[in-house]
C-alpha cells in the first residue's frame, strides 16, 4: 500500500499531537509526535487505525 511506504513526516507546526505511522523497514506501527500541519497520509490517530490500513 502506497501510504504505508511514505516516510514519517513531523511537519513544521508545533501542535504536538500523538500519532502513529507505519515503519516499512520494521513492519510495525510506531508512535510519533505530529506538529499538526504539512504531513502525509502515513499518519494515523490510533494504533488500531494504523494496523488496520497497513496490516502491521
Swiss-Prot record:
Sites marked Reactive bond for trypsin: 14-15
Note: Negative results: does not bind to and, hence, probably does not inhibit serine proteases plasmin, kallikrein and thrombin. Has no or weak activity on hKv1.2/KCNA2 (IC(50)=52 uM), rKv1.4/KCNA4 and rKv1.5/KCNA5. A synonymy between H.magnifica and R.crispa is controversial.
Disulfide bonds: 4-54, 13-37, 29-50
Family, similarity comment: Belongs to the venom Kunitz-type family. Sea anemone type 2 potassium channel toxin subfamily.
Annotated coiled-coil segments of the chain: none
Localization of this protein: Secreted; Nematocyst
A molecular function GO annotation: potassium channel regulator activity
UniProt PTM comment: Contains 3 disulfide bonds.
Record function comment: Dual-function toxin that inhibits both serine proteases and voltage-gated potassium channels. Has potent activity on both trypsin (Ki=28 nM) and chymotrypsin (Kd=1.8 nM). Shows inhibitory activity against 4 of the 7 potassium channels tested (rKv1.1/KCNA1; IC(50)=142.6 nM, hKv1.3/KCNA3; IC(50)=40.7 nM, rKv1.6/KCNA6; IC(50)=154.9 nM and drosophila Shaker; IC(50)=433.1 nM). Has an anti-inflammatory effect in LPS-activated macrophages in vitro, specifically reducing release of TNF and IL6 but not nitric oxide and reducing expression of IL1B precursor.
GO cellular component, one term: extracellular space
Protein known as: PI-stichotoxin-Hcr2f
Keyword Aminoacyl-tRNA synthetase among record annotations: no
Domain BPTI/Kunitz inhibitor intervals: 4-54
One protein family per Pfam: Kunitz_BPTI
Keyword set, alphabetical order: Disulfide bond, Ion channel impairing toxin, Nematocyst, Potassium channel impairing toxin, Protease inhibitor, Secreted, Serine protease inhibitor, Toxin, Voltage-gated potassium channel impairing toxin
Amino acid at each position: 500500500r502506497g501510504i504505508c511506504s511514505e516516510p514519517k513526516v513531523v511537519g513544521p507546526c508545533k501542535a504536538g499531537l500523538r500519532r502513529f505511522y507505519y515503519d516499512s523497514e520494521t513492519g510495525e506501527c510506531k508512535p510519533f509526535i505530529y506538529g499538526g500541519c504539512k504531513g502525509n497520509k502515513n499518519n494515523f490517530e490510533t494504533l488500531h487505525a494504523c494496523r488496520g490500513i497497513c496490516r502491521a
